């Protein structure tokens, strides 16, 4: 039977523990709330990583926060040239989370890094749904030059009411996502992804005999590989990623409306401070020839590559653009957009387009368009 002295000691011990732990818990909670209040995804992730890593044992913390190995491109090329054979130099990064500043940590988790897991594998693991291309709903899109009679060299001219009677104003929506299907492949720690993008043009303001038809829908599945790399670029830039993939794009229609093409592409991811640049080059592949090809001249208008640019104005405002140009034909396109916060995770977007190829059915038709709509936070893509 415990004595009165033993009971007193137990109570004193509980009191000491409570008085010591409660302030710690309060401080920890306040710090976590400060992280939650951050609107910028990059800075918020860095804040959470820093405070929660501090609660782990030293060995677990170091293991969990160790940065992902990257291919040192400069040393790989230099060593391969010196030895006369292929030499892969993979650089194991140090601590990915500096303990002194969330701002310094945020410099590591850039939008490009988060999009493609260049510095750290995402906790959602394989097969998780991730952002890919911009995902938006534009209730109002105005096109100054509708394509009333779309055509191609092998399919002739399409004469249908949904094209001939279309209005200049319509609704545009795009859904896009990607999922990692394999990670840390080969000695270079590459990742394999599946992506899907679907864009629709809806004649919602056209209340004719065919009430509010979908004028066109493009489907674009793709599979691609990304490789984290490290190399310096002029003017303080950094080469962060190399990649390659295969993409199929079609509108799912029968002749004469059918449009489709397949491409193999190579890409790179580069950063200059708040500016992210992703150039791509492509070639047509596995397409049918002759009269079996829906659009044999599509490369004349869509070119052989594009350049994506994104610039972070501040925590929640971005501008981005996509540029295409074929120097041989002089045809191309420019897309530009501005995203801004509305409330919570909801963003607004203003988007403009000039040139050829706003959709597959319009690949050889020049037009100008502008629209305004909504975009969910984290789904503005790059």
UniProtKB/Swiss-Prot annotation:
Compartments it resides in: Cell outer membrane
CDD domains: OMPLA
Substrates-to-products reaction catalysed: a 1,2-diacyl-sn-glycero-3-phosphocholine + H2O = a 2-acyl-sn-glycero-3-phosphocholine + a fatty acid + H(+); a 1,2-diacyl-sn-glycero-3-phosphocholine + H2O = a 1-acyl-sn-glycero-3-phosphocholine + a fatty acid + H(+)
Side of membrane Extracellular, spans: 79-168, 203-213, 251-259, 285-306, 326-332, 357-365
Gene Ontology molecular-function annotations: metal ion binding; phospholipase A1 activity; phospholipase A2 activity
Subunit architecture: Homodimer; dimerization is reversible, and the dimeric form is the active one.
PANTHER family given in the database record: PHOSPHOLIPASE A1
Entry protein name: Putative phospholipase A1
Organism: Neisseria meningitidis serogroup B (strain ATCC BAA-335 / MC58)
């Amino acid at each position: 039977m415990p004595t009165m002295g033993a009971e007193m000691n137990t109570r004193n011990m509980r009191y000491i523990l409570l008085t010591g732990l409660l302030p710690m818990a309060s401080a920890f909670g306040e710090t976590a709330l400060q992280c939650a209040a951050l609107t910028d995804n990059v800075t918020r992730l860095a804040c959470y990583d820093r405070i929660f890593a501090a609660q782990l044992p030293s060995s677990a913390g170091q293991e969990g926060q160790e940065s992902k190995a990257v291919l040192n491109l400069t040393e790989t090329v230099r060593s391969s040239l010196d030895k006369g054979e292929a030499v892969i130099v993979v650089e194991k990064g140090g601590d990915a989370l500096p303990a002194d500043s969330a701002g310094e940590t945020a410099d590591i988790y850039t939008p490009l890094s988060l999009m493609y897991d260049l510095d750290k594998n995402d906790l959602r693991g394989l097969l998780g749904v991730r952002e890919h291309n911009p995902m938006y709903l534009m209730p109002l899109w105005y096109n100054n030059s509708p394509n009333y009679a779309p055509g191609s060299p092998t399919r002739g001219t399409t004469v249908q009411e949904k094209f001939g009677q279309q209005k200049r104003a319509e609704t545009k929506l795009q859904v896009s996502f990607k999922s990692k299907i394999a990670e840390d492949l080969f000695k270079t720690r590459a990742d394999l992804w599946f992506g899907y993008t679907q864009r629709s043009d809806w004649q919602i303001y056209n209340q004719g005999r065919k009430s509010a038809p979908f004028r066109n829908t493009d489907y674009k599945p793709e599979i691609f590989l990304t490789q984290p790399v490290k190399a310096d670029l002029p003017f303080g830039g950094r080469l962060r990623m190399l990649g390659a993939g295969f993409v199929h794009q079609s509108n799912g229609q029968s002749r004469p409306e059918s449009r489709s093409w397949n491409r193999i592409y190579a890409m790179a991811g580069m950063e200059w401070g708040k500016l992210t640049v992703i150039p791509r080059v492509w070639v047509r592949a596995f397409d049918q020839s002759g009269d079996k090809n829906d659009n044999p001249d599509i490369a004349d208008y869509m070119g052989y590559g594009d350049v994506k640019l994104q610039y972070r104005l501040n925590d929640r405002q971005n501008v981005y653009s996509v540029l295409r140009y074929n120097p041989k034909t002089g045809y191309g396109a420019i897309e530009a957009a501005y995203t801004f916060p509305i409330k919570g995770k909801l963003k607004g977007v203003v988007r403009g387009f000039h040139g050829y190829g706003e959709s597959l059915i319009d690949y050889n038709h020049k037009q100008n368009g502008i629209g305004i709509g909504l975009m969910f936070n984290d789904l503005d893509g790059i």
